[in-house]
Amino acid sequence: MMRAVWEALAALAAVACLVGAVRGGPGLSMFAGQAAQPDPCSDENGHPRRCIPDFVNAAFGKDVRVSSTCGRPPARYCVVSERGEERLRSCHLCNSSDPKKAHPPAFLTDLNNPHNLTCWQSENYLQFPHNVTLTLSLGKKFEVTYVSLQFCSPRPESMAIYKSMDYGRTWVPFQFYSTQCRKMYNRPHRAPITKQNEQEAVCTDSHTDMRPLSGGLIAFSTLDGRPSAHDFDNSPVLQDWVTATDIRVAFSRLHTFGDENEDDSELARDSYYYAVSDLQVGGRCKCNGHAARCVRDRDDSLVCDCRHNTAGPECDRCKPFHYDRPWQRATAREANECVACNCNLHARRCRFNMELYKLSGRKSGGVCLNCRHNTAGRHCHYCKEGFYRDMGKPITHRKACKACDCHPVGAAGKTCNQTTGQCPCKDGVTGITCNRCAKGYQQSRSPIAPCIKIPVAPPTTAASSVEEPEDCDSYCKASKGKLKMNMKKYCRKDYAVQIHILKADKAGDWWKFTVNIISVYKQGTSRIRRGDQSLWIRSRDIACKCPKIKPLKKYLLLGNAEDSPDQSGIVADKSSLVIQWRDTWARRLRKFQQREKKGKCKKA
């Protein structure tokens, strides 16, 4: 009998080794350590390959929580044996306080010696509807190959095996054993297993015979008869089916000889109990093909020693910064290692984008976050605005991007050419940073037109007119302080308007300002309307800050009537009065209007 038991367990271990071989990992061999590669997770060329932890009895040495144990208080129990047709009973005492007479749960998972069996034992005659449960926590997720129990008593008439995948919070059935499946568990007897239900528990009457009275075995193989077992790598259903963090065995109904209700039923009932010498859970630490062993972490929790740039207790996610493709379980063909994002050494964080991954032909989906060293882009592969590439350094260099340093006055913007570093210069300005006037231009005092053409002096004759001044100081006197506005100045000009400068454009020898005329306080023969209008000022006047004017500012403009280049705008020149607007002036200008109507401008 004992020989048959050990032959059955040996067969299960052989199945486990075969499954390990199919998955590409080591089996149970006394020479495995000698034949193994130096790094089981990489091949001889250093390329990643699938690796799995050794096959173990995950129950060995672990605590088992049981709902019933004999010996508290001490109680009699009887062992039944048969001699021919004669049934014999030898009675003993179970006493939890006496180590020689105790049958604690620790005997379930200790070293199983067939020559010196140690048995856990329940209280006597806990018959249906009462049950007895054994609950084993594996400490982490395992991929379970089999669950086996060797009995010191007759095997149960009805028994169920459950598993938990969330550390005992919820339970799902793994397997049922009963001679009355429908009555006990509301399950059909030996229902066929198909691809549609291969993740469901079945009920069978195998292993439920009362005999042998001692030494019987119940062994459940998780993949036996499952249609997708031969293609386990590509079956997420079965991968989920064999995964467990906890195992629970529920003994539901005792096998009896039917004598428990006879006159001497007390002796008979003391002969019916559950006793188990060995509980085994054969399997491997679940690491999804990305680790060759499990280790204890700082919290003494069992975790996978992850490789292939993976992380997590089961190597079930990519470690930080390795999100260039989605996490996948390793297979015999592909290690499916996690790949680092390509950020050219300029970022420490990245994220995965499925749309980009699909567009790349499922090659790359990483997006870099918070690019440093003045870089930008999905891969931190170009320079951000205001910087350009230093082609003398590789893109991975921390100084691969140089500041444009565009001149605040000479440049038309802060962004330069990404390759050459050339800033966009205003008219008449040159240099890579727009920091000097071009040939034929001279510096002015205007931030709008910092460089103006050098005037060409006309030929001198006796009848020639006075020459144009050579510099701004002799041409006009720019305002250096606050300008004052009074009735006399108001009366001397043809128009007085409040304007808002919107934008400025160069037009030949003129600057054309688009302005919004907010209020009209005086106008000459040409009618001035409120709204958007063109204001024309000669380039020389702007260059010499006569008048001094800036975009996006509001001004009070007093000028003389003059035909504009477009015949519809107004003209200002070096003689015009341009003062930055103050709201307090509106009332004073209305008074000037009233005085003008009364003819006081003629006196002024």
Curated annotation (Swiss-Prot):
Please provide, in alphabetical order, the Gene Ontology terms of the cellular component aspect for this entry.
actin cytoskeleton; basement membrane; cell periphery; collagen-containing extracellular matrix; cytoplasm; cytosol; extracellular region; glutamatergic synapse
Stretches assigned to the NTR domain: 472-601
Query: Biological process GO annotation list?
Result: anterior/posterior axon guidance; apoptotic process; axon guidance; axonogenesis; Cdc42 protein signal transduction; cell population proliferation; cell-cell adhesion; chemorepulsion of axon
Q: Per the Swiss-Prot or TrEMBL record, what residue ranges does the short sequence motif Cell attachment site cover?
A: 530-532
- SS bonds (residue pairs): 119-152, 285-294, 287-304, 306-315, 318-338, 341-350, 343-368, 371-380, 383-401, 404-416, 406-423, 425-434, 437-451, 472-544, 491-601
Matching SMART domains: C345C, EGF_Lam, LamNT
Q: Which CDD domains match?
A: EGF_Lam, NTR_netrin-1_like
Q: Where is the signal peptide?
A: 1-24
Q: What is this protein called?
A: Netrin-1
Q: Which organism is it from?
A: Mus musculus (Mouse)
